[in-house]
Amino acid sequence: AEEVLVRDGPAGVTVRAVAAQAGIAPMGVYNRLGGKDGLVDALLIRGFDMLRAAVAGGSEPDLLDRLWACGLRYRDFALANRHFYAIMFEAAIPHEFGSEEVAVHAAAAFEALVQNVDLAAAAGQIQVADPREAAQQIWSTVHGAVALEMRDLVLTPDPAATYRATLLMILRGLAPAT
């Protein structure tokens, strides 16, 4: 399914196309995944797991550097995995986003950001009343910036520089009062 998504985009993800790619009859996809909804769930789970790995995968000793890198990796993930990003956040494949298993994996991706915020707050490198609330605000901001870029709606000459400036604005806004 992943190969079909990457090759053909969200519109190309059909039970028949995935079965052909796997060299099986379409019934095999139904038996294994329960049909189109199960197929899309499997792709969503894979996408959220990849996103979690990207944003959590920091070993920077300075926790502000880790938050900075986390933000950069979010954008890198989206740009490198446009079709996954589209099915995860743009409903590029009509699908009920109600699977409990998908929700668990989506929440785990968010928790990676919460953990980075919590660590930086506990170390006194940022000042937040509630790390989860701050993580939601950070995610909302970077997601908006990435979504605009994905749709070619960034109206500045260098989207990467604009994104970095957005991250800097976020981190300055979280800096402890002096």
Predicted segments — roles?
Residues A1-L5, V13, G47, L51, ...:
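Short hydrophobic clusters on alpha-helical segments that form packing/core surfaces
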Residues V4-G38, A42:
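Helix-turn-helix
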Residues A86, E96-A103, A107, A121-L168, ...:
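Hydrophobic/aromatic-rich alpha-helical bundle segments in the mid-to-C-terminal region
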Residues A1, A19-A22, G71, A135:
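Small-residue (primarily alanine) positions within well-ordered alpha-helices
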Residues I45-A69, G98-V104, A122:
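Amphipathic alpha-helical linker/stalk segments
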Residues A56-F84, A134-I138:
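Hydrophobic alpha-helical connector segments
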